[in-house]
């Protein structure tokens, strides 16, 4: 006798982008057990009166539930979604991914292979890059998702593990680090995190010339991670350190040059300015070297390489101020009452 199909719900936070239709179309294709429900959390601002722009395939029409997310970010939106779903497994998908062929069947196999102590199973993520040329800086940044750990682009959690950990921490306001934070708490609660066999593609989203500058807001979230999980959180979350130490040094050199110039110390200003210029040039060269080296990309790298270090340091400083004295993640007793984690 074959084992019964696993019961699961799908939760997708969305801003109503057109790519949501692509996710739903991929979910409807192939074979395998259907989810009990597909919860779309509408995370647009609450004052937006328009209905969520979505085209639901006929096969999913009876399963779709659209709930308001109030525009408080993906962590809060995912909490809104999974708390509405009683199923034992919650599959989180981003609204800009493309689940692979036969995704439902592959998910069922991943869940069937999960042991009683498995709290979460991550998909294998791929990032398609344009053929025939080197990827841009933004494309390479997105490609890093293929090797990232515990990203909720496609990650299924056991509901009892979510209850045990208290869900996503809504103090993470953007799609950055909120997934690693939850995974560390699930692991700390004694659950295992594994990688399954199902596959999902994460296409590169179109982005403006300043996307890499806006991404520096994540440095404030890194401060929150250190406050919550200790200074070695990167090792446990398998998150590379990145260039922040170099950004801090370059920013310090630039600030020193400006101060020296303002106080009439020309020699000190020249020395500090030379250090700033050398650091900025090295950063730009490191970003240009693996890229397509078109005129547009070259100018974009030169300009943003000068701007990124001080912006990164600024967000880090804001994070220090905002998260000073921060406490552990709050566990919602109303979610946990009457439920047990289901492992030893």
Predicted features, each with a name:
Residues 127, 140-160, 175, 181, ...:
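A recurrent flexible, glycine/aromatic-enriched loop bordering the glycosyltransferase active site
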Residues 90:
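Short aromatic/hydrophobic "clamp" motif used to bind/position activated sugar donors
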Residues 68-85, 153:
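Glycine-rich, basic loop-to-helix element that forms the pyrophosphate-binding segment
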């Amino acid at each position: 006798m074959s084992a019964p199909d696993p019961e699961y719900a799908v939760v997708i936070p969305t801003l109503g982008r057109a790519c949501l239709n692509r996710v739903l179309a991929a979910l409807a294709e192939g074979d395998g057990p259907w989810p009990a429900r597909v919860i779309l959390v509408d995370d647009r601002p609450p004052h937006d009166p328009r209905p969520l722009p979505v085209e639901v395939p006929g096969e999913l029409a009876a399963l779709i539930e659209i709930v308001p997310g109030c525009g408080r970010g993906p962590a809060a939106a995912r909490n809104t979604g999974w708390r509405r779903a009683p199923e034992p497994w919650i599959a989180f998908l981003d609204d800009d991914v493309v689940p692979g062929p036969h995704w439902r069947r592959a998910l069922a196999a991943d869940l069937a292979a999960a042991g009683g102590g498995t709290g979460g199973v991550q998909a294998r993520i791929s990032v398609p890059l344009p053929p025939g040329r080197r990827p841009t800086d933004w494309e390479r940044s997105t490609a890093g998702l293929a090797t990232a750990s515990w990203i909720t682009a496609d990650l299924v959690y056991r509901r009892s593990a979510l209850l045990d950990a208290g869900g996503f921490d809504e103090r993470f306001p953007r799609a950055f680090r909120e997934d690693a934070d939850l995974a560390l708490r699930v692991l700390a609660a004694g659950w295992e995190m594994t990688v399954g066999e199902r596959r999902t593609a994460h296409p590169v989203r179109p982005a403006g010339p300043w996307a890499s500058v806006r991404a520096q807001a994540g440095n404030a979230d890194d401060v929150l991670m250190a406050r919550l999980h200790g200074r070695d959180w990167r090792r446990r979350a398998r998150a590379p350190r990145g260039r922040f130490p170099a950004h801090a040094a370059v920013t310090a050199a630039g600030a020193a040059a400006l101060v020296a110039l303002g106080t009439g110390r020309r020699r000190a200003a020249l020395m500090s300015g030379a250090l700033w210029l050398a650091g900025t040039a090295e950063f730009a060269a490191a970003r240009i070297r693996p890229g397509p080296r078109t005129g547009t990309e070259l100018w974009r790298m030169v300009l943003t390489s000068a701007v990124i270090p001080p912006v990164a340091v600024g967000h880090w400083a804001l994070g220090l101020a905002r998260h000073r004295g921060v406490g552990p993640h709050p566990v919602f007793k109303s979610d946990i009452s009457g439920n047990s984690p289901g492992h030893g």
